Amino acid sequence: MDFTKPETVLNLQNIRDELVRMEDSIIFKFIERSHFATCPSVYEANHPGLEIPNFKGSFLDWALSNLEIAHSRIRRFESPDETPFFPDKIQKSFLPSINYPQILAPYAPEVNYNDKIKKVYIEKIIPLISKRDGDDKNNFGSVATRDIECLQSLSRRIHFGKFVAEAKFQSDIPLYTKLIKSKDVEGIMKNITNSAVEEKILERLTKKAEVYGVDPTNESGERRITPEYLVKIYKEIVIPITKEVEVEYLLRRLEE
């Protein structure tokens, strides 16, 4: 997939192939996070002992926002498939702009679900993938680092729904124009949903978790991530939020 060539990006098969590759990345990021405790203090704003000068927020927010500032300076967020968690902190790069062609509608950056992704990650995903409950102050930095990797992978996967939505819109402009004009959210949701594809995703994730989630050379080794939890995360979080992204993007598609 080449973002300088829109025809490769809006090809549904290319999009599906990219989403499959993202599965591997997300699984491995989850496995890395699974070595640590839940560490709730990392997510608590202004937690005693984790106060940060001139910053109001959690240790994770501080680490993530500062990383995004650095990444913005090297053009990360110029790429159409990257969505920042702190868009108001993004800085202009000193590198020459790549000048990607317009692939998505101009309002696409405004379709940003990262606040929701971060909230559901902390509240629902962390308890499923962590080694145990509780804090481990010696590993706060490592935990935040792994969390950022997980969040960025989830964000990219979920916001790829904008490319899915644009490709589907282009594939049947009359149908989607009618649905958008009538603000038929249910109709849009019905047309973007492919239950057979979703079922294949869950089946594939089950197999991947069975293979990746345990060390095959250690028969007594603990399973680092279970197929049940991985399927639950995709079925109840990743897929539904991706479809929310698609619907919001499509509802605005006829804007001038």
From Swiss-Prot:
Keywords: Allosteric enzyme, Amino-acid biosynthesis, Aromatic amino acid biosynthesis, Cytoplasm, Isomerase, Phenylalanine biosynthesis, Tyrosine biosynthesis. One of its GO terms (biological process) is tyrosine biosynthetic process. Pathway: Metabolic intermediate biosynthesis; prephenate biosynthesis; prephenate from chorismate: step 1/1. Changing G141S: Abolishes tyrosine and tryptophan binding, resulting in loss of enzyme activity regulation by effectors. Each dimer has two allosteric binding sites that can bind the regulatory effectors tryptophan or tyrosine. Can bind either one tryptophan or one tyrosine, two tryptophan or two tyrosine or one tryptophan and one tyrosine, which differentially affect the catalytic activity. Activated by tryptophan and subject to feedback inhibition by tyrosine. In the presence of both tryptophan and tyrosine, the enzyme is in the activated state. It is found in: Cytoplasm. GO terms for cellular component: cytoplasm; nucleus. Changing T145V: Decreases tyrosine binding, resulting in loss of enzyme inhibition by tyrosine. Enhances activation by phenylalanine. Optimum temperature is <38 degrees Celsius. One of its GO terms (molecular function) is tryptophan binding. Catalyzes the Claisen rearrangement of chorismate to prephenate. Acts at the first branch point in the aromatic amino acid pathway where it steers biosynthesis towards phenylalanine and tyrosine, and away from tryptophan. NCBIfam families: CM_pl-yst (TIGR01802). PANTHER family: CHORISMATE MUTASE. This is Chorismate mutase. It comes from Saccharomyces cerevisiae (strain ATCC 204508 / S288c).
